[in-house]
């Protein structure tokens, strides 16, 4: 399940970052970016725990 979800979230996050760059928005000041990074980290940790 995580083999599909994590790459999909990473692709959406990369497109979101590119959109922010093209619209000249601040990447660092946007709290949604930190939320997405937290979700990716949480899913990655959960995936590693399930493999063990």
UniProtKB/Swiss-Prot annotation:
For whether the record's keyword set contains Membrane, the answer is: yes
Question: What topology does it adopt in the membrane?
Answer: Multi-pass membrane protein
Q: Which GO terms describe its cellular component?
A: plasma membrane
State where the protein is found: Cell membrane
Membrane-traversing stretches: 4-24, 25-45
Q: Which UniProt keywords apply?
A: Cell membrane, Membrane, Transmembrane, Transmembrane helix
Quote the protein name from its UniProt record. Uncharacterized membrane protein YyzN
Species annotation: Bacillus subtilis (strain 168)
């Amino acid at each position: 399940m995580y083999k599909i979800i994590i790459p999909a979230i990473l692709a959406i996050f990369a497109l979101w970052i590119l959109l922010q760059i093209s619209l000249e928005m601040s990447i660092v000041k946007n709290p949604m970016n930190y939320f997405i990074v937290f979700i990716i980290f949480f899913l990655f940790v959960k995936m590693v725990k399930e493999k063990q």
